[in-house]
Amino acid sequence: MEASSSGTAELPRSLSRRAPSRATTMMIDRPNEDASAMDSELVPSSLASIAPILRVANEIEKDNPRVAYLCRFHAFEKAHRMDATSSGRGVRQFKTYLLHRLEKEEEETKPQLAKNDPREIQAYYQNFYEKYIKEGETSRKPEEMARLYQIASVLYDVLKTVVPSPKVDYETRRYAEEVERKRDRYEHYNILPLYAVGTKPAIVELPEVKAAFSAVRNVRNLPRRRIHLPSNTPNEMRKARTKLNDILEWLASEFGFQRGNVANQREHIILLLANADIRKRNDEEYDELKPSTVTELMDKTFKSYYSWCKYLHSTSNLKFPDDCDKQQLQLIYISLYLLIWGEASNVRFMPECICYIFHNMANDVYGILFSNVEAVSGETYETEEVIDEESFLRTVITPIYQVIRNEAKRNKGGTASHSQWRNYDDLNEYFWSKKCFKIGWPLDLKADFFLNSDEITPQDERLNQVTYGKSKPKTNFVEVRTFWNLFRDFDRMWIFLVMAFQAMVIVGWHGSGSLGDIFDKDVFKTVLTIFITSAYLTLLQAALDIILNFNAWKNFKFSQILRYLLKFAVAFMWAVLLPIAYSKSVQRPTGVVKFFSTWTGDWKDQSFYTYAVSFYVLPNILAALLFLVPPFRRAMECSDMRPIKVIMWWAQPKLYVGRGMHEDMFSLFKYTTFWIMLLISKLAFNYYVEILPLITPTKMIMNLHIGHYQWHEFFPHATNNIGVVIAIWAPIVLVYLMDTQIWYAIFSTLFGGIHGAFSHLGEIRTLGMLRSRFESIPIAFSRTLMPSEDAKRKHADDYVDQKNITNFSQVWNEFIYSMRSEDKISDRDRDLLLVPSSSGDVSVIQWPPFLLASKIPIAVDMAKDFKGKEDAELFRKIKSDSYMYYAVIESYETLKKIIYALLEDEADRRVMNQVFLEVDMSMQQQRFIYEFRMSGLPLLSDKLEKFLSILLSDYEDQGTYKSQLINVFQDVIEIITQDLLVNGHEILERARVHSPDIKNEKKEQRFEKINIHLVRDRCWREKVIRLHLLLSVKESAINVPQNLEARRRITFFANSLFMNMPSAPRIRDMLSFSVLTPYYKEDVLYSEEDLNKENEDGISILFYLQKIYPDEWTNYLDRLKDPKLPEKDKSEFLREWVSYRGQTLARTVRGMMYYRQALELQCYQEVAGEQAEFSVFRAMASNDENQKAFLERARALADLKFTYVVSCQVYGNQKKSGDIHNRSCYTNILQLMLKYPSLRVAYVDEREETADAKSPKVFYSVLLKGGDKFDEEIYRIKLPGPPAEIGEGKPENQNHAIIFTRGEALQTIDMNQDNYFEEAFKLRNVLEEFNKERVGRRKPTILGLREHIFTGSVSSLAWFMSNQESSFVTIGQRILANPLRVRFHYGHPDIFDRIFHITRGGVSKASKVINLSEDIFGGFNSTLRGGYVTHHEYIQVGKGRDVGLNPISIFEAKVANGNGEQTLSRDVYRLGHRFDFYRMLSFYFTTIGFYFSSMLTVLTVYAFLYGRMYMVMSGLEKEILRLASPNQLEALEQALATQSIFQLGFLMVLPMVMEIGLEHGFRSAIVDFFIMQLQLASVFFTFQLGTKSHYYGRTILHGGSKYRPTGRGFVVFHAKFAENYRLYSRSHFVKGLELLLLLVVYQIYGHSYRSSNLYLYITVSMWFMVGSWLFAPFIFNPSGFEWQKTVDDWTDWKRWLGDRGGIGIPVEKSWESWWNVEQEHLKHTSIRGRILEITLALRFFIYQYGIVYQLNISQRSKSFLVYGLSWVVLLTSLLVLKMVSMGRRRFGTDFQLMFRILKALLFLGFLSVMTILFVVFKLTLTDLSASVLAFLPTGWAILLIGQVLRSPIKALGVWDSVKELGRAYENIMGLVIFAPIAVLSWFPIVSEFQARLLFNQAFSRGLQISMILAGRKDKATSSHK
């Protein structure tokens, strides 16, 4: 038996021999898991088929242990047969574990039903069949029957191995045949159990589902394929060949689609048809689809295909002969497309490739159905081709997949140039030309498309394997890393800006400065030179198009090449012609007056230049005219007329995408007006503030003759002081190019604010506003959120009002209950906020008690103090407050009913009847104040309150309770009759006289018979609680609810009801939709260990949250007081409570499942109508058959309309993993599936399928749902290869799971999002936006939704980020959608038109690196393909954001990287060229333009400081200031002041202030603005400016973009100095120190005036930037200035800096490893990137060149020799340092004496040299300091150049020296940055101030942040669970 686990072929039938004494390894690290239950889940992937057997064994173990043992033995045998040598991963360990277990069970288990195993298993099988299957068919649900049939099938397989075939008795065999026959009907299903019998779920009984299923099952007259099968073919395959249930199975039999794919798409198409068919259809019963249903679905599905055929001038293969069954054929075509799409895997990203496949397969279908050979008769036809269920995958998808994968390998893990490999877009665009038909059908694998220029050999199969040889050319576009892309993509904008700048300079230069000077003939003539500039720029654009697309030329059509060459030739012609013409016109000047007056004269008299310009601008004039008529332009783009095609060919290259994107006239007018106003403001500001004031000083500088320089001037005779002019104008030009972004921020803020106000945003923003408008909320609710037939009713009668209240109360109460379950509100808040569900008992509307709180006590006091004589006056006072009036009437009527119900004695009731009659009569007759003593009311109120308190209290002794109740009630009666009623004794007497049994009346006390059992009745108890609240709540409920988040949600929900949203359709009419969430390895649910694990400060997550959310923690503890909850549940509740406050998958899933909860409530309201009982819905159960039917129907409709799929890509690996985190992720995801039965999980399953002694990996897309205890597999679809290795992770993850989504809409939700029940209720309204008629516009394809950032509650950083993000997702996207019309898709809660997008490439793009920001490309793609994106703010979805500086910076870096890659992409190029001019401006400034402007802001500072340094060091500044007035350079400072606005983050703050003002009031906005400034928001934004500019620039130059996972945890932890240094060294610290050096040099050597306020502002702003970049990470680092942590940080930093690196040493451990990683981008950059990097490094040599001439030792010499000698000194110093370093290495250990002698000699030499320099050459200490300033930058430049030239330097053998130089610089930089921190850490007040700064939000809420920071905690509190 030992051999069995090690590889022998034979397997013994008995386990009597001992197994090897190897320890079980399979169950290691599986805490809290039942081993017997889990073994089925730990099966190695290569043995996956035995998992069901082990599950069955576990299932039946309690029932019959012996049969369970036999099942396990069968599993072991099967495993051994599958992998006899145990070669698969984990197989040996698993078999060993199973063997041990079998040996143990063989001895422990004995047969129970018979004497031996064969009889035992037969008896058990028969019992199982009779007990569960036979009886269960009519009583059990399909999912239960599926499980039972699976068990029965497995049991029979086991039985056959135990019992020889002849000995299986007849009964067993008959049962097994019955199981086999019916098994297909009971397979695990997703939503529709289509073939189930017996008890069918309500969903399959819906008429629309029946009709759709019937249509799909119509296989009449479809020919059957007959194949000559080999004689040994199994019977199952033969049966499968002949049995066809529906159209999809017929297609599968013809083309070989997988079974899982067929089942998946069958349900998909049935649900699509059912949902479309029921819309606007009122029939309750029908069995046929509407003819229009299938036609409409077909039109939508094939709109893209028709477009593709038209573009390629190919005839569509969607053919319909006259005599065909059209609906059947339409369904065949739709099903075929969906089956192709469902199995296409990564090819789904190539929609036109799918069109090509469908085009050919549709032709095949037509051939099969309507060929001349075979009539459509339903007969079989013969064929030699054998089709199995993987034929389509093998012959069609896999070859294309291999091409994609081979190209992806060229990417070399994202390091190769984009031009070296073809991405998804390149391969897809191959199918945009007719040459795609050369691929042929069936696919010709020798076609050019499939042939790589170098075939990849099997040994090169690893993903990043380097491939050799030339790559194949790109298609249509080449992504090249260069900043020229910005000009190439947006050439019209840059040409406009350059021309405008030139025109303004000319006008300012030649005239008086007035814009009217342009009409002067000389000025106008010169202004016309802007067209020469335009011609040159156009030539540049034409050249760039040729150069940058060079790698795609081989794939270009001749017409494309011709166009590029002609464009270049024409541009070149104009670039030559216009300057020549202008030079001619100089001799014959022409003015504007003469020009216009002689226009009709002889052209020969006119300037040739004028005519040339006229012809030059003619195309632009035509384009402008077309721009004004968008429909005409759209028609031209889509036209097939040859003249128009020629014109459009010249205007823009013909492309499949980007046609007809022009907006309607009104939209055009709106965004054109926006931009014209903006550009006028910008240009006027530029002209009058920046350009015009600088003209005069420029002229003066150009006229100065400067002969004295302070350095060696290379061009001493250069005219006009051109260097100074460049130094002064460079910052001005940069600000001019950048400040449009500032004007955009201003205008978008204004327009966005106005648009938001007109959208009714923020009309209800406080609880006071809520109260004042609450009466109108139910009506608004009915109008917006109830189906339209109800909303149209006139609100005139009480019935309608009551109906409004009933519908509203159900939803409102569920909303309140959901907030209570989330612990947002307390029990008291809940009671005060609920609307009574039994509201028909009283004559007035019953409002929530929080509106009526304190109204009764106030009314009582008012009546007590009333001095008037008339009832009417008192009642008028009460009625003046409507809520008080409602409260008084309700209290009186409710009290009356409560008392009547309590009293059992008829006589007592008569007494009370007399009392109430007296009250009613006195009010009618207006003598109330005369009949009643008002002074007695307070006493009565108090006593009633006490009575109700006792009534509601819990009691143990019924007698005591009853006596207390009676006593207090008698007191109440006494007060009424004696203190309140003036004639109380008369009333009592009257009641006694009217008693029918007065003579027989017993001598007993009144009011002793009270029915105390009524309290158990829920509805009655609700009334008592409500009345008690009305009487007892003395204070105003103005602060109910207390929780800020609860307030925000209530006010937003109430406000949204008054906003413009579509009317709600009936549930059956609403669009069906899915939600898709991609998940990788993030936290699902925190474990108990996670909750209590303490960080270095002794803080656990639980403790932190207890302190941050104290009210929610208290509410949670109150909720746990329910004695029914077991302890186990309490610990689970604690984990959930913590997880729901983090950014976890559990939080996201809970939020998304609110959709289903809301749908079920809406369905229930509609189905049940007036019979709806809220208590039944809340319990989701009832004994009433009608109510049961209502609930079942509600669930069915919810299933029909909503699907939620979480794509857990690595769930399968997590399931098998031994890692604790992965394992917990698996168990938590499983728990989510079990908790939410409608949740579906998709994952990629990796299996090793053993064949020929190999275990190749096979990949599947699998869909799961929760079963009884474990997950249940629904669909399994084989993939052509690993799907996630080709593109970016997230879009690939979405793509593999998108096939399992359903419906017409798809919402993409990230796993850091949340949702709210009340918002989920609005979803059907939002989905109606897809059907909303829009004048002149297309229907939307993406609906953008508003987001609420839920992570801004504590630290200032979280608050800044939350506000910044909130402003972007509200006012930012509002303005993008309307008026600018450039909103795309930003990742999170957007809702896609699902069919539109699945037929056009999906919801995102996935090419490696270029599509790093994958989500926005989904929006680009949608827009380019004719989509239309909107934005809606009446609904919101929660979103988490990063809350610490480091995670925020990583996120910003990721986004900046993504924008860098976007700049290179074809999508941005196409949008930039296809949009009209103004929409293109919107597109630029709201996407990559923002990041380029950020970079320009930083470059402006550099340009200013380096320009000033040039002027200072050369001596030019000194000379200019001596000869000129200082006030003449103010324009430069004004321009830089503009730039600093951007730098300080005011651009971010403007939209924030506007949005906060809109939604919370402008007073709050202004206060928040000032608080943000006090909390150093400007430091934060300035710091982020550095992050954006660094990563954006580096990505364009060198690439190296990668997905950066960001922190989703809690923030309060201290980041070490070394960690901050690693993160910010290159992006901020180096640049900050460079600017510091520039400022210091300027301060030392500059001679500038210092009086100007603007100068001071600019200087301060630049110092501010330096300070922010160097110290922001430490200012925003918790405990950043605590002395002990500072000491620890220094120790850690020194250790990190000193440790040597090497292979496998992480960057956190060694500086050397980090240093190598930091240069990674330089290894893979292009030669262009290397040259640019070296060029940029040369700027550091300027310091040395400038400073050496300022030294005293130079003796004022201007000879170049001085600079040369300085290099000798520098190189000598470096050589000495190198000698010391080498000496330490060679002699330091073994020859210590030699090393000391060497050091002494060097020291003596140094002293000698210094002495000579001081004495002979007059060297000073100042010179020494200046030399440090000179040589430090030079050394850094050498280091930078050395890093770029790493390979040659390594070859020279001096790389170690470069490395040591690098380490020395890191030491210096670290010391400079660390020193101020160390000094400040000495002062404890600094640390306290920092804590206040960081956590002001928490302090203002009274939170114990100091305890969190200090790590002190109350153990009792934190351990309380």
From Swiss-Prot:
GO molecular function: 1,3-beta-D-glucan synthase activity
InterPro entries for this protein: FKS1-like_dom1, Glyco_trans_48_dom, Vta1/CALS_N, Vta1/CALS_N_sf
Descriptive protein name: Putative callose synthase 6
Broad enzyme group: transferase
Transmembrane found in the keyword field: yes
Residue intervals annotated with topology Cytoplasmic: 1-492, 548-560, 633-674, 743-1484, 1562-1564, 1650-1655, 1752-1759, 1818-1823, 1889-1921
Keywords for the protein's UniProt record, in alphabetical order: Cell membrane, Cell shape, Cell wall biogenesis/degradation, Glycosyltransferase, Membrane, Transferase, Transmembrane, Transmembrane helix
E.C. designation(s): 2.4.1.34
Gene Ontology cellular component annotations, sorted alphabetically: 1,3-beta-D-glucan synthase complex; plasma membrane
Species name: Arabidopsis thaliana
Localization per Swiss-Prot or TrEMBL: Cell membrane
Superkingdom, taxonomy of origin: Eukaryota
Extracellular side, ranges: 514-526, 582-611, 696-721, 1506-1540, 1586-1628, 1677-1730, 1781-1796, 1845-1867
Primary site of residence: membrane
SMART domains cross-referenced by the UniProt entry: FKS1_dom1
Residue ranges of the TM segments: 493-513, 527-547, 561-581, 612-632, 675-695, 722-742, 1485-1505, 1541-1561, 1565-1585, 1629-1649, 1656-1676, 1731-1751, 1760-1780, 1797-1817, 1824-1844, 1868-1888
UniProt family annotation: Belongs to the glycosyltransferase 48 family.
Substrates-to-products reaction catalysed: [(1->3)-beta-D-glucosyl](n) + UDP-alpha-D-glucose = [(1->3)-beta-D-glucosyl](n+1) + UDP + H(+)
Keyword presence, Transferase: yes
